From Swiss-Prot:
Gene3D superfamilies, A to Z: Mannose-Binding Protein A, subunit A
Presence of keyword Secreted: yes
Entry's Gene Ontology cellular component terms: extracellular region
SS bond list: 83-160, 138-152
Name of the protein in its database record: Phospholipase A2 inhibitor clone 02/03/06/07
Amino acid sequence: MRLILLSGLLLLGTFLANGHDTDPEGQMLNSVIESVMILQREFANLKHAFLTVHKARSFGSGSERLYVSNKEIGKFEALKEICDQAGGHIPSPQFENQNKAFANVLERHNKEAYLVVDDPANFTNWAAGQPNEADGTCVKADTHGSWHSASCDDNLLVVCEFYFIL
């Protein structure tokens, strides 16, 4: 994309250098070039701002994943839909630092939330005596980040997981 823009600008520069910048088409072309250059700078600034915020959030949590709550509560299927619509998903911590970042959200709100455990899981943080399918087929995390079997009909805090591929 940049190569095409640069090639176009080079050809345009050659055209304008031949004295065509005084006619209406040349002036319009100059205006378009200026607009493209402004848009390129704005895009670079937005990209830098986004990456700075992402790095700051990652630095604070120790995780490349971001765990966010909208403070609502609900059952598993409703929460799954909320997270899907937001572009995220129900948390699925794969490492201890991700589980800690998730637990920080739960501790801040003093509530439990659903999570999804991959099968087979690379990382688990089951509480003593867990999992216990008699308690349910879903999994919830407490405010300390320990995992427990739970009913999928429990009303728990909405927490969605987001991650960026950079």
